[in-house]
């Protein structure tokens, strides 16, 4: 871990980091998060019985769109040409959906924030589409799972076993 913050200038004011001289490399980031709900809500999602439509299809598209809009939402993020965004859903068969986002680029800076934002917007979309029947849903455990590429190299979240 580094202790130097790069988003401040010599006057201690915010700045966007200059990446002009950085090398273009292949960069990948994976993030994850969960939403826990009443078991009946999860069953209705699986059965296609949510009035707003296909929850997972809409949430998947929302997550992809979010990754593409990251630089418009997070002030110091660079506009990055993404080469791929994929959203995956798994559930425990009871009350929790896990969302994983994989984001790729070939550029001068990483896509960790894009992956994290994709997960968060995907989860918020699930919440939005199901809130009429379950306002007690809990969004949690959002974190970067893995990132690779660039000067800082490879990172794996400490509690994630390496495969």
Curated annotation (Swiss-Prot):
Q: Name one GO molecular function term.
A: cyclic pyranopterin monophosphate synthase activity
Q: Which InterPro entries match?
A: MoaC, MoaC_bact/euk, MoaC_sf, MoCo_biosynth_MoaA/MoaC, Mopterin_CF_biosynth-C_dom
- Tree of life domain: Bacteria
CDD domains to which the protein is assigned, alphabetical: MoaC_PE
- GO biological-process terms attached to the record: Mo-molybdopterin cofactor biosynthetic process
List ligand-binding residues for substrate.
76-78, 113-114
Q: Which residues form a coiled coil?
A: none
Q: Which SUPFAM superfamilies match?
A: Molybdenum cofactor biosynthesis protein C, MoaC
Involved pathway(s): Cofactor biosynthesis; molybdopterin biosynthesis
Q: What is its EC number?
A: 4.6.1.17
Which terms are listed as keywords in the entry? Lyase, Molybdenum cofactor biosynthesis
- Report the catalytic activity: (8S)-3',8-cyclo-7,8-dihydroguanosine 5'-triphosphate = cyclic pyranopterin phosphate + diphosphate
What general EC class does the enzyme of this chain belong to? lyase
One Pfam family here: MoaC
Q: What are the catalytic residues?
A: 128
Q: What does this protein do?
A: Catalyzes the conversion of (8S)-3',8-cyclo-7,8-dihydroguanosine 5'-triphosphate to cyclic pyranopterin monophosphate (cPMP).
What family is it from? Belongs to the MoaC family.
Question: How does the record describe its quaternary structure?
Answer: Homohexamer; trimer of dimers.
PANTHER family found in the cross-reference section = CYCLIC PYRANOPTERIN MONOPHOSPHATE SYNTHASE, MOLYBDOPTERIN COFACTOR SYNTHESIS PROTEIN A
Q: What is this protein called?
A: Cyclic pyranopterin monophosphate synthase
Could you tell me which species this protein originates from? Lactiplantibacillus plantarum (strain ATCC BAA-793 / NCIMB 8826 / WCFS1) (Lactobacillus plantarum)
């Amino acid at each position: 871990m580094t202790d130097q913050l790069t988003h401040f200038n010599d006057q201690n004011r915010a700045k966007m980091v200059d990446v002009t001289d950085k090398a273009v490399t292949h960069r990948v980031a994976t993030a994850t998060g969960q939403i826990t709900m009443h078991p009946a809500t999860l069953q209705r999602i699986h059965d296609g019985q949510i009035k707003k439509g296909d929850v997972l299809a809409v949430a998947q598209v929302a997550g992809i769109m979010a990754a593409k809009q990251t630089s418009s939402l997070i002030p110091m993020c660079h506009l990055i040409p993404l080469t791929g965004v994929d959203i995956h859903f798994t559930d425990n068969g009871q009350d929790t959906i896990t969302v994983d986002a994989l984001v790729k680029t070939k550029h001068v800076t990483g896509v960790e924030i894009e992956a994290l934002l994709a997960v968060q917007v995907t989860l918020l979309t699930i919440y939005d589409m199901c809130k009429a029947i379950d306002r007690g849903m809990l969004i949690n455990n959002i974190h970067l799972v893995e990132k690779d590429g660039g000067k800082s190299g490879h990172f794996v979240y400490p509690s994630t076993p390496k495969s």
